[in-house]
């Protein structure tokens, strides 16, 4: 079937951007910056996202093959808030911003909402994600925290049923595994593995900074310039690897009893 130009993905994105008056620019570093300035609004919403989620379990980085345990992307999301200087949540508390993050199957996103100190909050966000810091000690501490989160989701019938459904549909694809992994899988993580992930996927060309509210595109771009993600850099050679999936479902039925 031929694809009409007005129905192409690029045309649809352009139409959607025009409908919400969204500006966009790709920086020399490869980072995409999206901005929707909203006159009359007091707050600013920002999201810094990478194309790296739970289904990425194997990749090559500059020719070296790397395998990840289940839950790596989610674990990394937690660790990005911590640096040698302290916890990013403490910095956000001083500016009055509300911050959070989430991991999906194919994305990891870091967000904040604030009504003031926009430049300072953007600096916290970009610096936090741009300067990862991992040690064996901090990883061990986080393993205990995330282990409790995993147990919490184990008590959710909806989440367990969704996971069971994916295990029915897929034989090998990593979507079969819980986004957070298991207590056993995250115990395999090391600083070297996490740094390999940030080198491969937390690079400007694989990320998007999206802002909206009482902010301009120039402000967002200037924040990128201040925090070292504006200028062109030589990207690493990265190839994501997925297992060959069967044409038939793994199982035809699933049942789950929650007591």
Feature roles, as predicted:
Residues 1-88, 195-259:
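His/Glu-rich zincin catalytic helix
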């Amino acid at each position: 079937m031929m694809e009409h130009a007005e129905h192409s993905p690029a045309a649809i994105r352009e139409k959607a951007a025009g409908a919400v008056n969204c500006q966009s620019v790709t920086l020399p570093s490869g980072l995409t910056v999206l901005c929707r300035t909203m006159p009359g609004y007091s707050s600013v919403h920002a999201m810094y996202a990478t194309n790296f989620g739970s289904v990425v379990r194997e990749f090559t980085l500059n020719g070296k093959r790397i395998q990840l345990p289940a839950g790596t992307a989610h674990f990394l999301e937690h660790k990005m808030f911590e640096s040698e200087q302290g916890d990013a949540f403490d910095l956000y508390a001083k500016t009055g911003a509300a911050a959070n993050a989430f991991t999906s199957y194919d994305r990891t996103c870091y967000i904040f909402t604030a009504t003031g100190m926009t430049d300072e909050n953007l600096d916290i966000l970009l610096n936090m994600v741009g300067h990862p810091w991992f040690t064996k000690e901090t990883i061990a501490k986080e393993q205990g925290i995330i282990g409790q989160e995993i147990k919490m989701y184990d008590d959710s019938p909806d989440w367990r049923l969704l996971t069971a459904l994916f295990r029915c549909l897929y034989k090998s694809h990593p979507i079969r595994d819980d986004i957070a992994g298991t207590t056993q899988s995250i115990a395999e993580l090391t600083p070297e593995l996490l740094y390999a992930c940030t080198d491969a996927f937390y690079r400007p060309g694989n990320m998007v900074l999206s802002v909206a509210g009482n902010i301009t595109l120039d402000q967002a771009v200037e924040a990128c310039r201040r925090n070292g993600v504006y200028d062109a850099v030589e990207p690493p050679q990265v190839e994501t690897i997925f297992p060959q999936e069967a044409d038939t479902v793994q199982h035809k039925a699933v049942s789950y009893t929650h007591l």
